Structures are given as structure tokens and as C-alpha cells.
Amino acid sequence: AELYQRAVAQAAFSPVMQVHSETSGDPNPSQARTPWNMAERKGDSACLDTYRFFANVRMNLLPYLYTEARHSSRTGEPLMRSMAYAFPGDETAAEYEFQYMFGGSLLVAPAVEMGEETLDVYFPEGTWYGLFDGKAYTAGIHTVDCPLGTLPVFVKSGSILPLNLGESGKLGGSVGNATDSYQNLTFWAYPGGGEYSWYDYVNGKEETVKVLADGKMQRANGTESADIVLQGNGWRNSGQAG
């Protein structure tokens, strides 16, 4: 149950989120790694709960994922980037072989040892923010919590994340499986001001979004109405942008 939950959490932040299985020749018990089957086999409903949450997160991230995957297909730059690749001038970063960048904005630090509840994470130069809790981290090594059912993911300062969120406006909320519309297109912006060109896959066009240091958003070539939410360091005002 622990390995399954760790695997599906990390898979949400990889190019392909998919579970595989093989048969033993005996259909009872089934070897299928569907979350409902795993929950039944292991007698642990958390398998289903963890999968549901991270499957929803995956769909929430789709505007960001599509944009970053499109960048990879056009440039050859990998979607998952080792710390050594992403930060070539940082010798310490290269020592953290299990951490990686997922696209240009997200740092992922999966737990890889059985029973881990905390994890030492190395943050390169700058300020980083917890994707799920907004906590700020300065450069260096920090010990972070990683209980089962969670995954440490951090956002680089100055980033802008295009997201498709559900009614709650939070990561992990269901938006279904449709890719022909957005339920709530939302840009999460992080302190430092930045610019991000994202691909609007619903309307088939690229748009540049800029967030100034004061939190004001400027959009060029935008079709869909969207919310902006300013994240990090208590910077949580929100407003509408069209």
C-alpha cells in the first residue's frame, strides 16, 4: 500500500501517469493495479483516496503540462529534468539525484525510502514555495514533511502556473476528464513578477501572461476569461482578469 501511494503521487508529476500490472495466471486475486482493486487487496482505502487526489491534481495541472510538453516536443528539452541538468553551475544540486524539475517551474522531491516521514530537500538559488501549502523556502537544505499520501512539490519564485481548477479553487478538486473546455482557468502567480507563454489547448493558441511585481496581470492574445491568484508569503489577494 505504501509503495502504491508513493508511486501514484510521483506519477502525477511525470510525463505519463499510468499504472501497469501483469497477471499471475490466476484471476483471483486480480493483479490489476487499479486503485479500487489495490484498496481491496491491501485492505487500505487510502490507496483509492491517494490515487483520486493525485489524479485530480494531474487534471488540474493540464494547462501547465500541455504547455511544457509542447515546449519539450519543439526543443528536445526533457519534461523531467535532473537537478544537474536544470542547475549546471550548482554542484550541490547535482548530489540530489532523486529530486527533479518538472517543466521549468516545479521542483519535485519524492520520498524513495520505506517509512520516510521527512525528507531533506535542496533548494537552488532563489525563493521557492510549497505548491500545496504556499510555505516559502530560501536557498539551501531544508527538512520537509512527506507523510504517506503527500508529495513535496515546490514552485520557483516568479513563476506563473496556468491551472484548470474545480469549484473549490484548490488543487485536487475534480474537473472531470474533459479536455475541450476549462472548468475554472486560473493563473497562480508567485512573488517576483514574471512572464509565461502558455498554450491554450482548448482554443488552439498561444498566449503570453505577465504578472508585475505589484501583482497586476497583463494578458496578450487571451481568449478565455480567467482568475488570478497571488501565492506565497501571505500574498493572497485575488481578482478577476479577462
Predicted regions: what they are:
Residues T150-G242:
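Accessory, solvent-exposed terminal regions and/or long lumenal/extracellular loops of proteins
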Residues A1-T150, V155-K156, G193-S197, Y201-E206:
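Catalytic-domain carbohydrate-binding cleft regions of carbohydrate-active enzymes
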